[in-house]
Amino acid sequence: MTLPGGEISKRELHFIWIVDCSGSMRDDGKIQALNYAIKEAIPHMLRESENNIQANLLISALKFSTGAQWIIAPTRVNEFKWTDIEAKGETDLGQAFLLLSEILRIPPMTERGLPPVLVLLSDGQPTDNFKDGLEKLLSEPWGRKAIRVSIAIGEDANMDVLQRFIGDNERQPLLARNPESLTKYIKWVSTVVQTASARPKSQQKYYDGSISNVDIPKPPEIISGATDVW
């Protein structure tokens, strides 16, 4: 929509990190690699958002271990700063989904926003009832329509749970086997997926709003090798 004077009215685009900081993330430097990768992605997110005249990018972050909590409220990308998180406790993914569902309601979300981008990063198995939390998340309109991406940090991550979060058989969880691949995947989701959300398919004759109305490009191919540590 164009405002009087020719200025374009931007629509909110929420980008939300959902980060596993359970005790197993201490192993093999996983939590340090995650902190580094997100910090590295911030300048790329800023450049991408500056080229997108349609979206007002807001970044927030939710961590889960024993319980779940918001650690960063929705923040404009040019003001966003990542503070390193520590790993300890359980893997209460269901609690994270319940917290997430609360902010994806309308309100506080607006009806005319762009599809949110939800990025789940985890290295293990949920220790609570994640199914009820996921059901609640998907019962919210923006929970269903969100672009949901999951990144497995190492071979021990529960790929079935991460696939259920995505909810689309045409896309699979991304498997990061080392710090380098984690950094590449986080950069990809921070830039390419952000841009895709800001350009949803204009019209679909039979689109019913039940899933995200967005085409997502393929992620980068990463070949396993001797540097794999997870």
PLM features per residue range, with description:
Residues 69, 79-115, 127-129, 149-161, ...:
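Von Willebrand factor
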Residues 1-16, 21-32, 105-112:
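Acidic, polar low-complexity linker/tail segments
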Residues 155-204, 208:
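Von Willebrand factor A/integrin I-like adhesion domains
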Residues 13, 23-56:
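…and closely analogous acidic/polar surface helices at protein-protein or active-site interfaces
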Residues 18-22, 34, 61, 100, ...:
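DG-centered beta-turn motif at the end of beta-strands
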Residues 49-50, 138-146:
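Arginine/glycine-rich "motif VI" loop of SF2 helicases in the C-terminal RecA-like domain
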Residues 135, 154, 179, 197, ...:
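Extended acidic, low-complexity intrinsically disordered regions
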Residues 54-84, 159-167:
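Short beta-strand-loop
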